[in-house]
């Protein structure tokens, strides 16, 4: 970055997809709150889109965690006779509408970009204006597991097919980008059943398109410990949030000790008077 140049945003936050592992994003939010740091823009895919939007709407980390603690999968999806997907996710959309404080992107406290996949045209699509609940549902709609979501006549599915870790969406807009990748590892052991095979297949698909984005972050938060949790694990919300918090804290401390990047961090946080030591 040339001296004296400024980008549109100082600090951006990019949140990957990863199913229930996305609860780790809440732990990152908690650390940001404790440090008095607020991103200027957020981008998220799938679980990252859901968690990021709740945070962008002004919900505190602990409040977001309470929304999901003690929930059952049936509260978000309903098994159906398979047509376009095994589960109907209308319940998920109603959950979002019930808990989110706003109805549109324009009402959010922090600009938010939701990444989904345009199934009809075979490309990634970025939502950042208009109604917000359906784009979130689209971004989280894993193909075959959930029905595609139709928005303005176009079928959308999980954004992870093309862009599971959407750092590059905001890279050129921000001085500093913090990236949280909750999908970096999968165990070599797995069950030979349709669920495990599908989960593993999607994991490899999502992992394959994250390599470049991992190197695009100024600060990358990820750990193999995320791999201990399954895609639809709603029983360990507290544990996953804690892993996210501990990983973020450890990463932040390493980051500020790197002399070549410390100046970037300070530059991004100057207006907030919040520098981690």
Where are these regions (language model features)?
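Patatin-like phospholipase
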Residues: 1-45, 53-277
């Amino acid at each position: 970055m040339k001296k004296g140049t400024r980008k549109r945003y100082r600090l951006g936050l990019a949140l990957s997809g990863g199913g229930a592992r996305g609860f780790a994003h809440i732990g990152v939010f908690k650390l940001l709150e404790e440090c008095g740091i607020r991103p200027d823009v957020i981008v998220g895919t799938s679980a990252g889109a859901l968690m990021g939007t709740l945070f962008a709407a002004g919900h505190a980390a602990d409040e977001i965690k309470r929304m999901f603690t003690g929930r059952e999968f049936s509260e978000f999806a309903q098994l159906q006779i398979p047509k376009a997907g095994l589960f109907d996710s209308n319940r998920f959309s109603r959950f979002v509408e019930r808990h989110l404080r706003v109805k549109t992107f324009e009402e959010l406290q922090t600009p938010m970009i939701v990444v989904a996949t345009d199934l009809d045209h075979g490309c990634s699509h970025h939502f950042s204006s208009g109604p917000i609940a359906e784009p979130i549902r689209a971004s989280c709609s894993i193909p075959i597991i959930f029905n595609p979501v139709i928005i303005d006549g176009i079928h959308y599915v999980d954004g992870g097919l093309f862009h599971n870790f959407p750092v590059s969406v905001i890279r050129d807009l921000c001085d500093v980008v913090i990236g949280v990748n909750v999908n970096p590892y999968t165990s070599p052991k797995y069950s030979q059943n349709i669920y495990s095979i599908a989960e593993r297949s999607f994991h490899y698909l999502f992992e394959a398109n994250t390599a470049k984005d991992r190197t695009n972050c100024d600060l990358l938060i990820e750990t193999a410990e995320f791999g201990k949790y399954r895609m639809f694990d709603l029983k360990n919300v507290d544990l996953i949030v804690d892993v996210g918090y501990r990983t973020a804290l450890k990463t932040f401390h390493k980051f500020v000790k790197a002399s070549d990047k410390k100046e970037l961090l300070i530059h991004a946080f100057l207006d907030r008077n919040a520098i981690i030591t």
